[in-house]
Amino acid sequence: MNKSHSIIQTENNGLNVKCLNMEITQKHFLNKETSLTDLLKSAYRLMFTAKTMTDLFEQEKKITSKYVHATSRGHEAIQLALGMQLLPQDFVSPYYRDDSILLGVGITPYELMLQLLAKKDDPFSGGRTYYSHPSLRRDDFPKMIHQSSGTGMQAIPTTGIAMGMKYKEEIGIDDNLDEKPIAVCSLGDASCTEGEVSEAFQMAALKQLPILYLVQDNEWDISASADEIRAQDITQYMQGFNGIETRTIDGTDFIKSYETVKECIRIIREERRPMLIHAKVPLLNHHTSGVRKEWYRDDLEECAKNDPLIKLRNQLSEFSVEDSEVESIEKEVQNLVRTDFENAILAEDPKPEDAYKHDFAPTPITEEKGERSPNGKIPTVMVDCALFAIRELMQKHPEALLYGQDVGLRLGGVFREAITLAAQFGEKRVFNTPIQEAFIVGSTVGMSAVGLKPIVEVQFADYIWPGLNQLFTEVSRSYYLSNGKWPVSMILRVPIGAYGSGGPYHSSSVESVLCNIKGIKIAYPSTGADLKGLMKTAFYDPNPVVMLEHKGLYWSKIEGTEAAKTIEPDEDYIIPFGKAREVLHCDNQKGKPTLTIITYGMGVYWASNAAKQFDNQIEIIDLRTLAPLDENRVFESVKKHNRCIVLTEEPVNNSFAQSLAARISENCFRHLDAPVKVVGAKDLPAIPINSILEKEVLPNTEKLITEIEQLLKY
């Protein structure tokens, strides 16, 4: 008896299979027990659907090639084996070649074609992103967060989902289901050479997270073959990650794939630990519609011998399914796919105005509330105002947790910005991470998706760069590219700025880079009261927020920054984003020229100290948030005083401040008596550690006074 017959016998003798009704035009999970014969017929219907769609897309390439796409041809067996077994409480992150996973969970060909043709009713993105880039939030389907094109990008967010599941279980706020949820991350083998994928594996192994990694290995990158791009395959590579069990299988054998997936899912649901399936498969179609297989491959004939559809057809024959029944299935599928394609072509396209929907989720915080300066309190340093804000939030909200490098019990942050929190709330809610900025940032996508509010920290702004890939590709775009389904509710704390001989790797300002990432909000407070109020607002805002916290203001140790210490606001104090603060009012009645200084962060104190040298001629506006920006307040002040300095700690050229100056010039041109001046650091690659050199590079009060004098005389 051959292997497939042996498996069939085992199935018939007692291994019941939870399966689906394969009326392909509707969601097919009916949660009923069925025979292996019915399972195989159902799988064949779906697998033939995937092939028919691939063939149709090729036949109609004059239409379908308008938007780039890839299909699962050759990968169908393992993908269907996975998709058909997932439950509504599960999360799955398919990648761009995984349309068979989508068919397996119940997405119809028509819905997939709406995305292929970028139609308005594309259920995933409303015509905003590519074919087989799903995002799904339906009650009776497995959930799918926004998926991007960057190889391996889904590994960190999906591992964040698993981390969130475990956290909720550990502190008792999960749904307490009989069958616990799992996270599934699908990857191509070539993507596993990405460093961020290793960060995800590291955390899954370290924390023993309930996640299944499915790695589909077709031995191709695009045109690069396996021997060009990897030192070992994923099975060998995973030997370095203690705690992730790996199964290696023939991913073209549906029965073996189904059994393996079933067993792995059972283990993860029950034992809550990570597993990886390494499925070896052929790529039978093009890399994408724009990179055709015949251009560079010489293995196509050999790969065709491992076609999973042919193997499944043979298994049906071995299991006594008549050819006439199979042919009937094929005819039904062909008619359905053709009809769905014709209907999808006729579907409505998005309107131009649809492009502006879902850039940000609506925020509940629209006005300042609470007591900013309660009676009977003494001034509190800025770092403690942040600490107290987070403490109050964690006391009130079990979904709040804090993690990052060195924020845990022993240290509480290198600036003591998280001191006492781990002791008070426990090391499940406040914990250290490895040195993995990408994971720290990107995991918040998954944590947010399961209903948590992660507050995370990058230790210095200088070290945010490894996290920018996740911030830009996943965090900032999730709400927009999921067409409003998946906002990422998170706070990213970033200690920033120079604080006295910090040197080139502990003094940087990075706000201009961040301000060019659309879809995130950016706060940059200059006082303890503002830091606490904005931290609270950030928590209740459903969008991602970057909180830039100036290290030189944390303790007010730098001369002239004493005013950063403020009375700590009460627990209910909140400040809406996009509302600037007037630090110094100027209403000159003596006919002297006046000017306004628009600034933020440390610039508030350079400006405040410089203004003392002038007799009621300076108005100072503290932006407080850089995105959104309070343009109305800025323009109002500039139009009142007719002269303006935009003051920043960053180098001037190509900076946020220079961009703001251009906006001021454009909107206030008729009111200006002088060019808008930008004052900032010198345009050099880094801030030197030597104090003499540092002083030369950075702006300060004395340099600002000179610029003010010149502008007032203009």
Question: What are the residue ranges of the model-derived segments?
Answer:
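Glycine/charged-rich beta-loop-alpha catalytic/anionic-binding loops adjacent to active sites
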Residues: 59-64, 128-148, 178-184, 242-246, ...
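Alpha-helix C-terminal capping segments
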Residues: 80-88, 159-170, 202-210, 239-240, ...
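Conserved acidic/glycine
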Residues: 1-78, 84-86, 279-425, 435, ...
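Active-site nucleophile and cofactor-binding loops and adjacent substrate-binding regions
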Residues: 67-75, 96-97, 134-155, 249-254, ...
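Cofactor-binding active-site loop characterized by glycine-rich and histidine/acidic residues
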Residues: 52-55, 59-207, 225-242, 504-506
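A glycine-rich helix N-cap at a beta->alpha junction
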Residues: 118-124, 205-214, 429-432, 476-494
